Structure formats: C-alpha cells, structure tokens
C-alpha cells in the first residue's frame, strides 16, 4: 500500500521495477516461486471474477438436494473460451470445468513439456484475454455495458 504522502492509491503498489500494479491479496500468492509451470502434469485452476460479481450464471434447483449452475450468456462465452484452449495449446488436455456464479474452476493436463519460454501462466493468460475480448464483443453488440478490457470481467490476478 502507498505510504502517507505517496501518489500510490490504497490497494495499489509499485513492483520492483516501479510499475503500478494491484496489491495481491493473501490468497493470490499460491504459485510456488521456483516451480516449473511448463512441465507435464495436471493443474487445478480457479479464476475469480473481479469484485466477485455473480455474472457467470445462477444456481438452480434440479431436484431434491440437487443444485446446478445455469450459465448466463457471459458464462457460456467463458466456458466456450476455456474449451477452445486446446486449439492454441495442443500440448494441453482439458479434464474438467465447473462454472460458478462468480468464479470458475478448471482442471487441465499439460501432456508434454510446453515450448521454451511458455508456461501455465501463458495458457491461462490467453484464456482470460480471449474471454474478456469475447465478452466485450457480446456486450458491445447488446448496446453497451462495461468494457471488460477496461474494468476486467475476469480478475486481473490469476489465482492458482
């Protein structure tokens, strides 16, 4: 957080190179610092919407004690973008996904070592970027709404 008299607003920090970034919350530092996230293994991903806005779907009762999430239009776009990951990343197999009103869970298998310089962060970053872009197109076609590229439909921070 910015010090008294600092130009940095609360909730924002300067990184080691002087760039402004959102302050990480305690639950956002779950990556292992020296771990190779390009290696062959199964990864469980959770991505939370900024401000936990419940815009991906709604809980509906299917039967006695049986509930499900019915995706909204935006939730459907996010699911479609997730399921297209393998088009750009043939080294990846999608195992499972679960949409919740304000967050998303996915399990993926990196079947083979990713190309040099690429990691799980690149895969998830491209998914979030594409989702935000596609949701932005959807909102623009409907005559407005917040531009997700500016306000961020998907959280700016990856939670792993």
Question: Which positions does each model-derived feature cover?
Answer:
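Short catalytic/metal-binding and nucleic-acid-binding patches
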Residues: 1-160
């Amino acid at each position: 957080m910015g010090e008294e008299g600092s130009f940095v607003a609360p909730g924002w920090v300067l990184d080691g190179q002087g760039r402004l970034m959102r302050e990480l919350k305690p639950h956002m530092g779950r990556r292992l610092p020296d771990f190779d996230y390009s290696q062959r293994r199964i990864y469980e991903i959770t991505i939370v919407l900024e401000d936990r806005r419940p815009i991906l779907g709604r809980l509906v009762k299917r039967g006695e004690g049986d509930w499900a999430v019915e995706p909204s239009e935006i939730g459907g776009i996010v699911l479609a973008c997730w399921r297209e990951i393998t088009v750009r990343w043939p080294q990846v197999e999608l195992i499972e996904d679960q949409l919740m009103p304000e967050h998303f869970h996915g399990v993926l298998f990196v079947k083979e070592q990713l190309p040099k310089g690429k990691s799980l962060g690149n895969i998830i970053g491209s998914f979030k970027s594409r989702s935000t872009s596609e949701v932005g197109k959807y909102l623009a076609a409907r005559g407005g709404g917040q531009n997700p590229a500016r306000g961020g439909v998907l959280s700016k921070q990856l939670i792993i």
